[in-house]
Amino acid sequence: MTAIETDTPSNKVKEDESTDLRKDREKKKRSRVKQLLADIAKQVDFWFGDVNLHKDRFLREQIEKTRDGYIDISLLASFNKMKKITTDSKLIARAVKNSSVVEINLSGTKIRRRFPLGEKPQDVDSRTVYVELLPKNVTHSWIERVFGKYGMVVYVSIPRYKSTGDPKGFAFIEFETQEQAAKAIEVLNNPPEEAPRKAGMFPKTVKNKHLPPVEVTEHSITEGCGTEEKKKKKKKKSKARKDSVEKAEEDTKEQDMDIISEGVPKRRKTVSESSVPDVQEADKQTAKKEKKKKERAESFDQSEKVRQGKRKCSSSEEHDCSSAKQKKSDTKDLPQDEKPMVTQEVLQECKELSTEEEKDAVDKKEISVPKVKRKRKKKHKERHRVGEEVIPLRVLSKTEWLVLKAEYLTLQRASMASLKKSMSEMNHISEEEMQTQPSMQSFDIKNGKVETVKNEPLGPQFVCGVIGKITSSDPLQGRKYVKDAFSGVCEVVYVDMLEGDTECHVRFKSPEDAQTAVKTRSDLQGKHNWKLQILAGDNEQRYWQKILVDRQAKLNRPREKKRGTEKLIAKAEKMRLAKTQEASKHIRFSDGF
């Protein structure tokens, strides 16, 4: 019985601990789910809100397709932003259960707006601001945090490049009222000095790929980023100067201490304590020390002039020092046995002088160091305050931006017109050249008007005995390699092969070229291990039929349509490349020059 009684309380304690742990886990799960549900509800309410639906054509069309306005929740789960949060349709339905914007059907699989969508407001442009010079990695949350201080931000649009997905460097922010937009423009319109004077960013592209913009990092958002680096450099220089001055002070102190120690005569040694060679070595060392001291004194003469708090010796101290030096010189002249013993009074005086100097220097350092630290801290705080308040952005109303856009479009049209004119002048062929070259156009007169009809270029015409077949034991290296092999013997028009093939067809310019190639068959066999055969009869006709079929398939292949400015710019680019190739050609002079 005693064993049972002792076990029961411990079991109860364990059960209590386990229940506490379960409660803690449940609490943690609830907090996470609450945040998740709040994020889902916020996103869905935004999608079905008036501001977004007036701009989101895809979602508006999906709602208009249905008779009752319901759309599947699975469609919302397929959106990229919702994928980052969750893909569970049931969790989405649970999140928007108590929403004031949307409602769910009885089965919990479809969702719709509670109230029908009204007409689009007319004052959207006046409530919208345009902002440029944004950082490269700008996000919606960053814009909401910066612009949300001056009003309720209802919509943020960050245009991005299709090719890379990078932001274009500008954005449009819609506020709830016009007053909030005007306040944001007044406070946040602080463009840096390096920025262009005229506002309006219209990014340029080359072959549907944007030119790399100027990188603006997070550090460049706060004002005075470059000035901070300069100040840091100045601080480093000032620190180095202070360190050099302090070193000079320490060296001068050591020098003074050495002079005092030199003024004090050394204790007399007996014959048993030191030998004669030891004394000679000691004299050499003292001579070296004196030389070093003289060099130090000369190098730090300038620093001693600038240095404040320099110790000035009184007449009594100078007298003591000079007397000590005289004593030292006298003792040097005397033999070692006759040197007098140093009194305790002289040693105490020297110690007192050194301690007074050290105290003065320490007091000066204690006074100067805290002042410098305080100044640095104040500057650092002021810098942070400036960085929080001032952001180098250019902000203006969307109505002003639309005016700039119209100006840009007129300039673009004018430049395109001048480009067309210059291209037509370049493509214009003179009458003399037209007479020399065969005309590719036929003229048709209808109703008194002359219409030009372009004759389509014909394909390769059938010529007997110009097709050769090459077979190799190893994969062929390429078309250029095959052409180069025949270059010294005959002229090759086309090589029909794919990469890695062991067989290929060669079309020669004339039957005579084909016959000359056959004559060099043995050379090709020995050098390249190729077998050459000229096609004839049915094999030749089948191959010519294949040529025509391949050509027709190539002509009927769907091409990427280019219209407007893209087509014009592509033509101009081709002409520019042709010009550069002509200019890069070598000029060949005759032997006479």
UniProtKB/Swiss-Prot annotation:
The keyword Signal does not apply. Residues 1-28, 191-363 are annotated as: Disordered. It comes from the Eukaryota. It is found in: Nucleus, Nucleoplasm. Residues 461-574 form the xRRM domain. GO terms for cellular component: nucleoplasm; nucleus; ribonucleoprotein complex. PROSITE patterns: HTH_LA, RRM, XRRM. Residues 30-121 form the HTH La-type RNA-binding domain. GO terms for molecular function: 7SK snRNA binding; U6 snRNA binding. Keywords: Differentiation, mRNA processing, mRNA splicing, Nucleus, RNA-binding, Spermatogenesis, Transcription, Transcription regulation. Residues 127-205 form the RRM domain. One of its GO terms (biological process) is spermatogenesis. Residues 12-24, 295-307, 314-340, 348-363 have a biased composition (Basic and acidic residues). InterPro entries: La_dom_prot, La_HTH, La_xRRM, LARP7_La, LARP7_RRM1, LARP7_RRM2, Lupus_La, Nucleotide-bd_a/b_plait_sf. SMART domains: LA, RRM. Residues 248-259 have a biased composition (Acidic residues). Residues 231-240 have a biased composition (Basic residues). The keyword Nucleus applies. The xRRM domain binds the 3' end of 7SK snRNA (7SK RNA) at the top of stem-loop 4. Belongs to the LARP7 family. PANTHER family: LA-RELATED PROTEIN 7 (PTHR22792:SF62), LUPUS LA PROTEIN-RELATED (PTHR22792). Core component of the 7SK RNP complex. Associates with box C/D small nucleolar ribonucleoprotein (snoRNP) complexes. RNA-binding protein that specifically binds distinct small nuclear RNA (snRNAs) and regulates their processing and function. Specifically binds the 7SK snRNA (7SK RNA) and acts as a core component of the 7SK ribonucleoprotein (RNP) complex, thereby acting as a negative regulator of transcription elongation by RNA polymerase II. The 7SK RNP complex sequesters the positive transcription elongation factor b (P-TEFb) in a large inactive 7SK RNP complex preventing RNA polymerase II phosphorylation and subsequent transcriptional elongation. This is La-related protein 7. It comes from Xenopus tropicalis (Western clawed frog).
